[in-house]
Design a protein with these regions (language model features):
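Conserved ABC ATPase signature
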Residues: 138-142, 146
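Conserved beta-strand-loop-alpha-helix hinge in the C-terminal portion
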Residues: 218-244
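Helix-to-loop junction immediately C-terminal to a conserved catalytic motif
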Residues: 52
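Conserved ABC transporter NBD signature motif
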Residues: 60-71
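A short, proline-enriched helix->beta-strand linker immediately N-terminal to the Walker B motif
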Residues: 157-161
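Conserved ABC ATPase "signature" region
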Residues: 115-133
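Catalytic Walker B motif of ABC-type/P-loop ATPase nucleotide-binding domains
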Residues: 163-166
């Protein structure tokens, strides 16, 4: 039985009077590698910002278990966020600090560990992502793929239960991207973490994703959710099929009828709940 880790209900994202996405309702289950996908400018990274507490919804709820992120007090929100690790698109490493010093930042902020203990943890995290021996290297001295892995090591510093990635494959060659995909799978399986990824890289989506939501810029809402591979095979939504097949295979909706959201891999009970649940 699946257990929801993050519950998004009736979420509307807006900048002032401009609505970017509305009425988003979906669950990220524990152990998922959950893909946020859709065309350019549809609001993927903005949704990620809502999930990690950097942007407040215009309407709706983001819940971690039984706790509503934006209704919680500062201490409760801080507790939730300490359970999250984030890898930004640019890796966001401090260029003036070594890799070990970068990883030490959250440990120094949120723990009472000694310098020696922090150094040991930094070395362990770097070894976990294949960077053993690179503690004293600066970001400028390593490749783009290694920077991504170092950023991932820092994201794991506090042993989070959920990891967020914003376009992790951006700027990587196909081999480095494939290696990063394998690393994400290994970490999910070995650490039992939930993973949420913003990406439009189809190879990564199909290689590691088991659940997803598809955002549409034109209708300004989600038009599909579920296993990406199942959506590619079964979706009747033209936009979804075109995206997932690079436009090589079309499946037009019924003539004169706007396509509704595809809910592949979702039980009837869950679908009913997604459509009707209000907090």
């Amino acid at each position: 039985m699946t257990e929801p880790h993050i519950i998004v209900n009736d979420l509307t994202m807006a900048f002032g009077s401009f609505v970017l996405q509305r009425d988003l309702t979906f669950n990220v289950n524990r152990g998922d590698i959950f893909i946020i996908m859709g065309g350019s400018g549809c609001g993927k990274s903005t949704l990620l910002r809502h999930l990690i507490g950097l942007q407040q919804p215009a309407k709706g709820k983001v819940r971690y278990g039984d706790v509503s992120l934006w209704d919680a007090g500062p201490e409760e929100r801080d507790r939730i966020m300490r359970g999250c690790g984030i890898l930004y698109q640019s890796s966001a490493l401090w260029s003036s600090m070594t890799l070990a010093e970068n990883i030490a930042i959250p440990l120094e902020e949120y723990t009472d560990l000694s310098s020696a203990e922090i150094r040991e943890i930094a070395s362990l995290k770097l070894a976990l992502v294949g960077l053993a021996g690179f503690e004293d290297y600066y970001p400028s001295e390593i490749s783009g793929g290694m920077k991504k892995r170092a950023g991932l090591a820092r994201a794991m510093a506090l042993d989070p239960g959920i990891l967020f990635f914003d376009e992790p494959s951006a700027g990587l060659d196909p081999i480095s991207s494939h290696l990063l995909d394998n690393l994400i799978l290994e970490l999910r399986d070995s650490l039992g973490a939930t993973v949420v990824i913003v990406t439009h890289e189809l190879a990564s989506i199909f290689a590691i994703g088991n659940n997803s939501v598809f955002l549409d810029a034109d209708s300004k809402t989600m038009i599909a959710s579920g296993d990406p591979k199942q959506l590619r095979a079964e979706s009747k939504n033209h936009t979804v099929r075109s995206f997932l097949t690079r436009g090589l295979e079309d499946a037009p909706a019924e003539e004169g009828k706007a396509p509704g959201p595809d809910l592949c891999g979702t039980s009837q009970k869950e679908e009913t709940k997604q459509k009707g649940e209000k907090l």
